[in-house]
Structures are given as C-alpha cells and as structure tokens.
Amino acid sequence: MSYMQSDNQPPASVSLPDARTMKVYGNGKVAVKPNVAIVQLGVVTENKSLHKAQQENTEKMNKVLQTLVNLGIPNKNIQTSAFIINPKYDYQNGKQFNQRYQVMHMLQVRLTHIDQVGIVIDTVVNQGVNRITDIRFTTDQTDILYENALQSALQDAKRKSYIIANTLKLPISPMPIRIVERTINPPAIYKTAAATTEGFAPPIQPGQIEIEAAVELVYSY
C-alpha cells in the first residue's frame, strides 16, 4: 500500500519559537589635555582693481608665511585651506554700484606647542592677518585614547546587560550575538569669528578634550 501527498498540500514544517533578544548601549569617555591646536587664519583684501586686491593680498600673505616660519612652525604644518575671489557691490534702489573685488586667502596652521597659540595669533595679526575663523584643540594620541574609551564602552554595556538579566532573571548568553560601534561627535571646538587687532596675545584656554566611544550590544536569551 502506498500513500501519495497532494501537490496542493504544504510541506510539513517544525514551528520554532521566536528568538528573544536584548539590546543594551554602552558609553566610554577619556578626558585628556590637548597637545595640538589647528588654527584657520587668513588675509582678506578689497580693491576696485582686482589686480591691486590680489597684489596686496599676496604681499601680506608672504609676510604672514615668513612670520609663521620664524616662529618655528614647519612648512608641512602650514597649508592653504581656501583662496576665494568675490566681486562686491553696494546697492541703492535695487541697483548695483561701487563694484570692487574681495580676495581671501585662508591658511590651516597646525601648532604642536599650544601654549604659544595666543602669541602666534597676536604676531600674525600684526603682520596682516584679519580673519581667524576657527581654533580647534585636539591630540596626536587620538587612536590610543579612542581604544581606551571603546574598552570602557564595552564594559559599560556588558555591566548593564548583567544588571538587566539578574533583575529580570533572564538566561542571557555570555557573549553578544551582535556588536555595533556607534558614531560619536569629534572633540570640542573653540571658535572665534575674526582676528583681534589689539597689541597683546589673546588668552586662549584649551582646557580638556574628551574622546568618546559608544557601542550597541545585542544578547539572545
């Protein structure tokens, strides 16, 4: 005797319970005194003659570059970040007049002696710098410090998972089934809008920066 299964009958299957998971987040942080400052500074000139605006800008920038070198900043730590030429106008009754040209040459300067940031700014301002748009403090040990913060984040997430499991009596697996590294904003930035023309070094305070890491762990139970 033989039996035949109808083509319209679905195949036999075993129903498995849905896998249960628990997601926890961990954060780690390392505070450190910065040892690098990155300064965005530049020279802006205006003139009705584009040629004269460029010439004046070039002369001032050459003085600034030589001043930076004289201050002991290596050429490899000085690079052009922007060079922009814009026509400028005044308006009256919707009409343009007084056309002129603005030339802006911006530099990114990396300083490894951050206690000299104020002196550097004061010196280059006296040589023609009239635009300082950004001062950022960081560290050249970012990779090592981030690894330390990442370890702290993993321990934080693991600790939270144990607390939840013990409180709710959940039989979670000892190892997570998924680990996700989450994005964290870069270290804090100190910004200033324009250069000062006062004859003294501005009191720049770097303080401390924080290197952060965050993770997401998923456990099954």
Whereabouts are the PLM-identified features?
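Short, charge-dense linear interaction motifs
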Residues: 1-127, 131-133, 138-144, 148-221
